[in-house]
C-alpha cells in the first residue's frame, strides 16, 4: 500500500472565510414596532449559507472517522446521533426567527395596489363590445381585404411622408392610404360604401398625380383603380349581399342615422322607465348588455320607422312628379263607378292586349273546351314528331366497275363487295339511268319554274310605258269572253282600232312621261299610289316596312321551329338574336304608328275595356219587366204587366 499524504491544516479553508455574513437592517414601521431584515435577498439566503458551512464540517468529520478505521466504540455512535439532533435543532432555531420577521414585515408593510387608472373594472364587457362590429364595418373590412389583395407590393399600405417622397405634402393636399382607411373603419368613420369608394379613388388619384406615367407607382395605381372599381361596383356588391350573411344587413346612410336616433330614444325611454330607488353606477350601466326582448323590440321599432320613411320618400317623389307634370297629372279622386279587375297592389294596371283575339262566352265562335285543357301537358317523350327515315334495305347499291388501265388482262373487272344486287341488275340500271348525275337539269328546271313570269312581266311593263297603259287594257279586253253574236270580222276591227289608238298615244306622249315610265318600270307595271299629304305617304311607308319586318320575322320563326334539335335537348330552341331584333323593330314601328292615330282607329271601345279588365256595372233591372230567364228555360207564355200594378206573372 502506498503512503497517503496528509493534508496540512493550513490548506483547509472553511467556507466562513470566503462568505461574508449578511448584514441586518432594522426598519421601523408604525412607530415602536421593529422588524429586522437582512441586506441579502431574504432570511432564506442566510440559512442557505449556514447550511453549506455545516455541510462542509460534517464532511471533514466523516473523513477523519474513515481514517481511524473500525476502532470506534458503540457509544460514539450514540454521541454522533445526539450531536446531529442538536445541529438540526440549532438550524431550525436559526431559520425560525427570520421567517417570523418576514411574516411580521409582510403583515405590517402597507400594500399598494398599482392599477392603471385607464383600465375599467368591467374590462371583459368592454372588450366584448369592441369585438362586436356593425354589419357596415364587417362589410367594409371585407372589401378592404379584397382591395389590399390587389396591392401585392404594399405601395398603398402606409402613409407617404416627405422623407419617402420629397414635396409630397405640397402637391397632395388630401393624402390617403389603406391604414388610414382601416382606422376610419375601426372608428366608424364611414356611413356608407360610397364614402369608402371615394377615399379609394382619392388614394389612387393622389398616386397618379404625384408620380409620372412611366413609373411603376403610376402603373400600379392605375391597375389598382381599375380592379378596385370592379370590386366596388354595384353588381359585385349585390352578389356579395347574396353570398355573405352580414352583407345582406347593410343599410343606407339615412337608415343608419335613423337607427342611431332610434337607439338613443330607446335608451332614454328605458332609463326613465327604471325604478328611481335603485342606484345604478354610470360605468356599470354603460357596459350592461341589453336583453333579447329589448333587442327584438328595438328591431321591430326600427323596421316600422324605416317603412314609414320609405313611404314618406315615395310620397315626396309622387308630389314632385305631379308638380313637374304641368297639370297633366292630378291627385283628384275620380268619382267613377268603374273598377279595374286587373289592378296591381300599387294602384297601376296594364293593357293586356290591344286587339284581343281570345273570344269570351257569348261571342260567335267561342269554344269553351280546348285540346290543351283536356290532354294537359306532355309529361314524357320528345317535343317533335318522329321524322321519316328510309330503311337501309330499300337502298339499291350496284356493282362498281374497275379500270386498271392497259396491261391488266387478268384483273377483276368489277367489285361487288358492297353491292346488294347482281351484275345483270346493275347493268340494267346503268343502261337505263346512266352514270351521270342529273342535278344540273333539275336545277335549270327549278329556276325556270320560279322565274317564268318575270320576263313576261318586264315586257308588259315596257309596253305599258310606251302605250300609257293601253297594252294592259288591250290584254284585259282580249281575255274577256266575247259575245256570241260577234263574229271574226268584228274582232279584227276592234283590234285595228285598239292598235291605232295605241300608236297615236305613243306619238303624243313619247317625251312627256319619262319619269312616270321609270317609276312604272321599277314597280313592274303596278299603278303608283297617290297620297293626299306627305304625312300619309310616310305613314304608308312605315306600314309597308312593318309588313316586311313581320314577314321576315315569320320566316325566321319557321326556320327555327322547323330545324331538328339535337338529341340531347328536350326543350325547343330559344329565339335567336335576329328574331329578337326583328320583334323589337316591329314593336317600335307599331308604337310610333299608334301614337299618330286615335285609339278608336285601332280598336273598339269594347276591346280596350276588355283588355284593361274594366267591368262596367250592369244596369238596374228593377225597373225593367223583362224576364232574363227566358233564354235558359223552355219557351212559355209570359204576360208582362207594369210594375206599378204587379210584378211579372208567368202562365
Curated annotation (Swiss-Prot):
Keyword DNA-binding in annotation: no
Residue numbers covered by motif Nuclear localization signal: 65-96
Keywords on record: Bromodomain, Cell cycle, Chromosome, Coiled coil, Nucleus, Transcription, Transcription regulation, Tumor suppressor, Wnt signaling pathway
Name of the protein in its database record: Bromodomain-containing protein 7
Compartments where located: Nucleus; Chromosome
SUPFAM superfamilies: Bromodomain
A molecular function (GO) term: lysine-acetylated histone binding
PROSITE patterns, A to Z: BROMODOMAIN_2
UniProt record, GO biological process: regulation of transcription by RNA polymerase II; Wnt signaling pathway
Location of the Bromo domain: 131-235
Naturally occurring in which organism (per UniProt): Gallus gallus (Chicken)
GO CC term (a single one): chromosome
Biased composition (Basic residues): 58-69
Gene transcribed to yield this protein: BRD7
Keyword hit for Disulfide bond: no
Regions of compositional bias (Basic and acidic residues) in chain numbering: 70-105, 271-298
Primary site of residence: nucleus
UniProt-annotated stretches for the region Disordered: 36-133, 257-298
The protein's role, per its UniProt record: Acts both as coactivator and as corepressor. May play a role in chromatin remodeling. Participates in the Wnt signaling pathway. Transcriptional corepressor that down-regulates the expression of target genes. Binds to target promoters, leading to increased histone H3 acetylation. Coactivator for TP53-mediated activation of transcription of a set of target genes. Required for TP53-mediated cell-cycle arrest in response to oncogene activation. Inhibits cell cycle progression from G1 to S phase.
A Pfam family reported for this protein in Swiss-Prot or TrEMBL: Bromodomain
Domain of life: Eukaryota
Coiled-coil annotated spans: 533-564
Amino acid at each position: 500500500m502506498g503512503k497517503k499524504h496528509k493534508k496540512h491544516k493550513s490548506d483547509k479553508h472553511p467556507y466562513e472565510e470566503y462568505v461574508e455574513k449578511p448584514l441586518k437592517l432594522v426598519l421601523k414601521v408604525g412607530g415602536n414596532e421593529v422588524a429586522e431584515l437582512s441586506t441579502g435577498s431574504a432570511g432564506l439566503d442566510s440559512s442557505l449559507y449556514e447550511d453549506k458551512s455545516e455541510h462542509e464540517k460534517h464532511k471533514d468529520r466523516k473523513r477523519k472517522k474513515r481514517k481511524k478505521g473500525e476502532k470506534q466504540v458503540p457509544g460514539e455512535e450514540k454521541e454522533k446521533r445526539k450531536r446531529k439532533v442538536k445541529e438540526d435543532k440549532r438550524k431550525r432555531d436559526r431559520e425560525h426567527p427570520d421567517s417570523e420577521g418576514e411574516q411580521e414585515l409582510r403583515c405590517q408593510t402597507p400594500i399598494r395596489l398599482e392599477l392603471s387608472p385607464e383600465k375599467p373594472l368591467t374590462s371583459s364587457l368592454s372588450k366584448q363590445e369592441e369585438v362586436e362590429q356593425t354589419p357596415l364595418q364587417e362589410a367594409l373590412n371585407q372589401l378592404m381585404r379584397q382591395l389590399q389583395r390587389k396591392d401585392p407590393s404594399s405601395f398603398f399600405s402606409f402613409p407617404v411622408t416627405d422623407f419617402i417622397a420629397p414635396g409630397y405634402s405640397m402637391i397632395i393636399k388630401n393624402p390617403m392610404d389603406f391604414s388610414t382607411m382601416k382606422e376610419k373603419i375601426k372608428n366608424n368613420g364611414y356611413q356608407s360604401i360610397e364614402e369608402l369608394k371615394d377615399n379609394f379613388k382619392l388614394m389612387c388619384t393622389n398616386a397618379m398625380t404625384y408620380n409620372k406615367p412611366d413609373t411603376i407607382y403610376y402603373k400600379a395605381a392605375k391597375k389598382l383603380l381599375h380592379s378596385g372599381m370592379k370590386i366596388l361596383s354595384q353588381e359585385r356588391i349585390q352578389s356579395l349581399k347574396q353570398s355573405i350573411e352580414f352583407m345582406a344587413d347593410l343599410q343606407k346612410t339615412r337608415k343608419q342615422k335613423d337607427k342611431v336616433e332610434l337607439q338613443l330614444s330607446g335608451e332614454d325611454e328605458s332609463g326613465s322607465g327604471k325604478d328611481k330607488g335603485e342606484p345604478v353606477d354610470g360605468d356599470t350601466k354603460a357596459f350592461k348588455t341589453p336583453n333579447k326582448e329589448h333587442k327584438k323590440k328595438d328591431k321591430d321599432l326600427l323596421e316600422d320607422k324605416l317603412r314609414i320613411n320609405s313611404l314618406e320618400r315615395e310620397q315626396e317623389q309622387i308630389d314632385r312628379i305631379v308638380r313637374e307634370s304641368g297639370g297633366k297629372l292630378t291627385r283628384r279622386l275620380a268619382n267613377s263607378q268603374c273598377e279595374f279587375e286587373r289592378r296591381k297592389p300599387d294602384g297601376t294596371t296594364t293593357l293586356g292586349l290591344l286587339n284581343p283575339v281570345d273570344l269570351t262566352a257569348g261571342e260567335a265562335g267561342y269554344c269553351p273546351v280546348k285540346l290543351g285543357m283536356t290532354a294537359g301537358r306532355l309529361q314524357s317523350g320528345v317535343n317533335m314528331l318522329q321524322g321519316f327515315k328510309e330503311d337501309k334495305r330499300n337502298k339499291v347499291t350496284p356493282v362498281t366497275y374497275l379500270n386498271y388501265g392497259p396491261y391488266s388482262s387478268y384483273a377483276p373487272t368489277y367489285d361487288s363487295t358492297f353491292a346488294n344486287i347482281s351484275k345483270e341488275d346493275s347493268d340494267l340500271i346503268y343502261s337505263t339511268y346512266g352514270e351521270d348525275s342529273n342535278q344540273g337539269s333539275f336545277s335549270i328546271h327549278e329556276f325556270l319554274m320560279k322565274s317564268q313570269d318575270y320576263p313576261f312581266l318586264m315586257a308588259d311593263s315596257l309596253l305599258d310605258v310606251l302605250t300609257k297603259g293601253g297594252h294592259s287594257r288591250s290584254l284585259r279586253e282580249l281575255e274577256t269572253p266575247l259575245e256570241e253574236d260577234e263574229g271574226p270580222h268584228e274582232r279584227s276591227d276592234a283590234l285595228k282600232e285598239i292598235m291605232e289608238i295605241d300608236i297615236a298615244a305613243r306619238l303624243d306622249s313619247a317625251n312627256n312621261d319619262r319619269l312616270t315610265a321609270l317609276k312604272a318600270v321599277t314597280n313592274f307595271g303596278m299603278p303608283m299610289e297617290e297620297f293626299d299629304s306627305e304625312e300619309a305617304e310616310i305613314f304608308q311607308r312605315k306600314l309597308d316596312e312593318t309588313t316586311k319586318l313581320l314577314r321576315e320575322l315569320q320566316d325566321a320563326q319557321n326556320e327555327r321551329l322547323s330545324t331538328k334539335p339535337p338529341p340531347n335537348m328536350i326543350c325547343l330552341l330559344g329565339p335567336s338574336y335576329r328574331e329578337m331584333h326583328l320583334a323589337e323593330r316591329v314593336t317600335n314601328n307599331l308604337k310610333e304608328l299608334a301614337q299618330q292615330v286615335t285609339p278608336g282607329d285601332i280598336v273598339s271601345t269594347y276591346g280596350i275595356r276588355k283588355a284593361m279588365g274594366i267591368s262596367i256595372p250592369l244596369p238596374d233591372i228593377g225597373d225593367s219587366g223583362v224576364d232574363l230567364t227566358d233564354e235558359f228555360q223552355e219557351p212559355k207564355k209570359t204576360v208582362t204587366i207594369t210594375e206599378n200594378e204587379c210584378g211579372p206573372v208567368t202562365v
